[in-house]
UniProtKB/Swiss-Prot annotation:
The RNAP catalytic core consists of 2 alpha, 1 beta, 1 beta' and 1 omega subunit. When a sigma factor is associated with the core the holoenzyme is formed, which can initiate transcription. This is DNA-directed RNA polymerase subunit beta. Belongs to the RNA polymerase beta chain family. GO terms for biological process: DNA-templated transcription. It comes from Liberibacter africanus. Keywords: DNA-directed RNA polymerase, Nucleotidyltransferase, Transcription, Transferase. One of its GO terms (molecular function) is DNA-directed RNA polymerase activity. GO terms for cellular component: DNA-directed RNA polymerase complex. It comes from the Bacteria. DNA-dependent RNA polymerase catalyzes the transcription of DNA into RNA using the four ribonucleoside triphosphates as substrates. It catalyses: RNA(n) + a ribonucleoside 5'-triphosphate = RNA(n+1) + diphosphate. Its EC number is 2.7.7.6. Pfam families: RNA_pol_Rpb2_1.
Length: 146
């Protein structure tokens, strides 16, 4: 007696072809379930958007909600200017081989404004302005497979 395993056919998906041994053929394509998460994370980071073109959402909104930071005395203020990502230190394959997180360095550009405050009138005048790029840490990235 011969066993009937049904028809074999291949189903294509993001990681390649997969053999299907079911009796009924696939009616719809297998959805890329991670696509929503990848698109959302890309929208949060806005890596491919120029700093001056970024809308006030995602990581940009997070930084804007914290800054400016003002000194209690009113003599200084720290403003958020923008953020940028450096290229990843290692590519995806190197990270897999070395058991590392695939990530990019995040730097923010801050502006320090120092005021000269008049003791009698309380009037402020700008004494000094400095801008500096500051390393904030590594931000994990999602690969094409999630």
């Amino acid at each position: 007696m011969r066993r009937n395993d049904g028809e074999r056919h291949c189903v294509q998906w993001s990681r390649g072809a997969r053999k299907f041994f079911g009796k009924n053929p696939e009616i719809i394509d297998i959805p890329d379930l991670i696509e929503v998460q990848k698109a959302s994370y890309d929208q949060f980071l806005m890596m491919n958007t120029a700093p001056e073109d970024r809308p006030n959402e995602g990581l940009q909104a997070a930084f804007k909600s914290v800054f400016p930071i003002k000194a209690f005395s009113g003599a200084a203020m720290l403003e958020f200017v923008s953020y940028e990502f450096d290229p990843p230190k290692f590519d995806v394959d190197d990270c897999l081989r070395r058991d590392l997180t695939y990530a990019v360095p995040l730097k923010i550009i801050l502006r320090l404004i120092v005021f000269d405050v008049d003791e009698f009138t309380g009037a402020k005048s700008i004494k000094d302005i400095k801008e500096q790029s500051i390393y904030m840490g590594d931000v994990p990235l999602m690969t094409k497979d999630g």
